[in-house]
Design a protein with these regions (language model features):
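Bacterial Sec-dependent N-terminal signal peptides
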Residues: 1-24
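Terminal domain-start segments
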Residues: 20-88
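Surface-exposed loop/turn elements that mediate protein-protein interactions on large endomembrane-trafficking
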Residues: 62-76, 112-124, 192-196
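Short, exposed beta-strand/loop patches in secreted or surface proteins that constitute
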Residues: 65-68, 84-90, 153-159, 190
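Short consensus segments that form the blades of beta-propeller domains
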Residues: 77, 100-106, 176-181
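Exposed beta-strand-loop-beta-strand "reactive/processing" segments of non-cytosolic proteins
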Residues: 84-104, 166-170
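Mid-length scaffold segments of soluble, non-membrane domains
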Residues: 93-126
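Short aromatic loop motif centered on NTY/YTY
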Residues: 122-194, 198
């Protein structure tokens, strides 16, 4: 019984530290990542989340900056109509940052840091898996492959686990052609191993 109580106390303390760590990580984020959002505004947003108030402030450009979701280890921020930012605590010494710009097709950048925002090497073991459906002719398959460039990579971090989804956007294609191309190059989900996403 004592062991169970000790474990419960440990888990409770650990969760509290995780929640505090994410708040601190967010507040101490370098200004260079979001130059139009000051440290005091980041603190204000985190306070609003804790108070269950509307977590939104105006940036120096007059855009509404809003925390869409904040948990013990995940944050999703809408910086403006064209910019999304995600932060995920992957382990005790690693956080992932995904910045996505929509202009209008979405393109993302993935960065890894330690909890003091010092950069770490980013390794994403991803190979584009282009597969020809059995019902598709060789000619149609060859035609579709010529449509696949240029393409933009979009990342999404999971709020529920340490996974990273990878999908593709095609800024020059019609909706019809995007649907056709998606049949041969589907999105993938990669998992954090402690060193890389694979």
């Amino acid at each position: 019984m004592k062991k169970i109580l000790i474990i419960i106390c440990f888990l409770t303390c650990w969760l509290g530290v995780s929640a505090q760590s994410l708040r601190e990580v967010w507040i101490e984020m370098p200004d260079s990542i979001l130059p139009y959002l000051s440290k005091s505004q980041r603190t204000e947003l985190a306070d609003y989340v804790e108070m269950k108030a509307e977590p939104a402030v105006l940036s120096t450009f007059g855009d509404s900056v809003r925390i869409e979701r904040m948990t013990n280890n995940y944050l999703l921020l809408k910086a403006n109509e064209a910019t999304r930012l995600e932060i995920k605590l992957l382990d005790n010494n690693t956080l992932a940052l995904v910045q996505t710009w929509m202009a209008p097709a979405a393109e993302s950048k993935l960065s890894l840091f330690n909890l003091q925002w010092q950069p770490k090497e980013v390794v994403v073991d991803y190979k584009a898996n282009i597969v020809k459906p059995e019902s598709m002719s060789d000619e149609d398959f060859a035609d579709l492959k010529t449509l696949m460039l240029p393409r933009l990579k979009e990342y999404r971090l999971s709020a529920d686990n340490n996974s990273l989804s990878v999908s593709w956007n095609y800024p020059l294609l019609s909706k019809k052609d995007v649907k056709r191309v998606t049949e041969i190059l589907k999105s993938q989900v990669l998992n954090w191993t402690g060193k890389d996403f694979r």
